[in-house]
From Swiss-Prot:
One of its GO terms (molecular function) is box H/ACA snoRNA binding. The keyword Phosphoprotein does not apply. This is H/ACA ribonucleoprotein complex subunit gar1. Residues 137-194 are annotated as: RGG-box 2. Its main location: nucleus. The keyword Plastid does not apply.
Amino acid sequence: MSFRGGRGGGFRGGRGGSRPFTPSGPPDQVIELGLFMHDCEGEMVCQSTNVKIPYFNAPIYLENKSQIGKIDEVFGPMNQVYFTVKPSEGIVSSSFKVGDKVYLSGDKLIPLDRFLPKPKTVGPKKPKGARNGPAGRGGRGGFRGGRGGSRGGFGGNSRGGFGGGSRGGFGGGSRGGSRGGFRGGSRGGFRGRF
């Protein structure tokens, strides 16, 4: 899961998105964002320790508010977020040690619930039998055919089977045919009588 371009203008602009950062000095206060894990192709790979998601391109600092780079990418599952930092000029990613903390300004974070699906509103209940739509006309839960069609099967004349004529089989066989394998048994059964 990548958070780039999230809903409502993610990390690359758009309505409510991040604006281009202009050099304005360090923020009044920085908060911990995550821990350095390792470097990869000249960038810092870090694990987030914050419950919120950082903006793309947000400036990253040390605890003393000296800027070391900017967020390049955010990835991973919702409950274990990672991010990469593109170091500023003169900063070498391999010079950091595992567990070193990185910080950012608190106004460069997005609440996690912005990325979670909204709960569905409960609508009026559908009339009985409306779930299968016009395809189930006349049958008892069947997918096609009228009164003489299938009664729960996917095709043919089966009464609960997936195809063919058996009363509960996966395929083939009339009522008087073979009852072995997956074909026989009670209506809607899967095992049959051997």
